[in-house]
Amino acid sequence: MAILNILEFPDPRLRTIAKPVDVVDDSIRQLVDDMFETMYDAPGIGLAATQVNVHKRVVVMDLSEDKSEPRVFINPEFESLTDEMDQYQEGCLSVPGFYENVDRPQKVKIKALDRDGQPFELIAEGLLAVCIQHECDHLNGKLFVDYLSNLKRDRIKKKLEKQHRQRA
């Protein structure tokens, strides 16, 4: 396993739309393993392949406190099951150090493939619903900062660009 480099906003590669996985093979399972290692190391609760510059529709997440509930979503799709919205303070490994409130549908139905390529469906609410929507956004080239005002997004962008310059 390997820890992968996480792209940071405003890197344009984060805007790439990920391609579906045709076959879940050993290379995809290795990617999943590397993504889990990267996510746990960061630490985070979710990671999309786009964030590690692999433009395939793969998401990993683990909402547990003790890394005991790893979840894999390959080619995930979701649909909202309610018009009711929940507001959560979201953060992102690609937007480090920033947390902002985002409104999202509070209940969604997810369809995806698991680590072995087997299809499954899941009804998600609360943090799981927020997380899957956030990670699916990554696969579509969208970030949580896109839900913010231009002023907030530009402020975050400028601060991260300054941090990047200071590290260079």
Swiss-Prot record:
Chemical reaction(s) catalysed: N-terminal N-formyl-L-methionyl-[peptide] + H2O = N-terminal L-methionyl-[peptide] + formate
Q: Which Gene3D superfamilies does the UniProt entry name for this protein?
A: Peptide deformylase
Q: What is its EC number?
A: 3.5.1.88
Source taxon at top rank: Bacteria
Any GO BP:
co-translational protein modification
Iron keyword on record? yes
Record key words, sorted: Hydrolase, Iron, Metal-binding, Protein biosynthesis
Against SUPFAM superfamilies, the record matches this protein to: Peptide deformylase
Q: What class of enzyme is it?
A: hydrolase
Necessary cofactors: Fe(2+)
Molecular function, one GO term = peptide deformylase activity
Q: Return the Pfam families for the record.
A: Pep_deformylase (PF01327)
Q: Where does Fe cation bind?
A: C92, H134, H138
Instruction: Identify which residues the record assigns to the active site.
Output: E135
Q: Kindly state what the record says about how the cofactor is bound.
A: Binds 1 Fe(2+) ion.
Tell me, in a sentence or two, what this protein's role is: Removes the formyl group from the N-terminal Met of newly synthesized proteins. Requires at least a dipeptide for an efficient rate of reaction. N-terminal L-methionine is a prerequisite for activity but the enzyme has broad specificity at other positions.
**Record family assignment:** Belongs to the polypeptide deformylase family.
Show the PANTHER family listed in the entry: PEPTIDE DEFORMYLASE
Q: What is the designated name of this protein?
A: Peptide deformylase
Q: What organism is recorded for this protein?
A: Ectopseudomonas mendocina (strain ymp) (Pseudomonas mendocina)
Q: Lineage from the top down? A: Bacteria, Pseudomonadati, Pseudomonadota, Gammaproteobacteria, Pseudomonadales
Q: Which gene encodes it?
A: def
